[in-house]
Design a protein with these regions (language model features):
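Low-complexity, acidic/polar, glycine-enriched regions of mature
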Residues: 1-151
Length: 151
């Protein structure tokens, strides 16, 4: 998982390779993201992210749980399928219903999932101090790429 914020003043990017995910045969899914797992180019950005914005000591995980409409075994054809993941996105303790366009593709041993969507910090009660507000975009681009192994 990766997020990216761009403004004329500064770009901010972080990656997290500690995400756990589950996709069931009926299309039900769950993603869990440990907030402390995000890594930034600058240590100070990471510290501010965890202590001041996401408050990882209080809200240690983000999550997205729901289902993919019309998810069937017929999708195991090796082709890429556009789907809509519907569920509850929880960030900073705030739940929000979301519909996120995604692609799924059977790779022979499991599912490759990709999605790009935006999150507004204000929608999740994440307060950005006025002094740095022009350095953080009002919407953050989130990219998810996951390979889920069938069990």
């Amino acid at each position: 998982m990766r997020f990216f914020s761009t403004t004329p003043i500064e770009d901010i990017e972080a990656e997290n390779h500690q995400t756990t995910a589950l996709l069931q045969a009926d299309g039900a899914f769950a993603f869990r993201v440990p907030v402390l797992g995000f890594r930034f180019e600058k240590a100070l950005m990471e510290e501010h992210f965890n202590e001041n914005y996401l408050e990882s000591h209080t809200y240690p995980n983000g999550s997205f749980e729901g289902s993919i409409d019309d998810f069937t075994d017929a999708m195991k054809d090796g082709e890429s399928h556009d789907v809509l993941a519907k569920g509850v996105l929880t960030i900073h303790g705030v739940e929000q219903q979301r519909e996120i366009p995604s692609t799924v593709q059977w790779n022979g041993t499991g599912w490759d999932i990709e999605s790009v969507f935006t999150v507004a910090p204000a929608d999740h009660n994440i307060n950005i101090p006025k002094v740095v507000r022009n350095k953080i975009a009002p919407t953050i681009e989130v990219t998810v790429q996951a390979n889920l192994i069938a069990r």
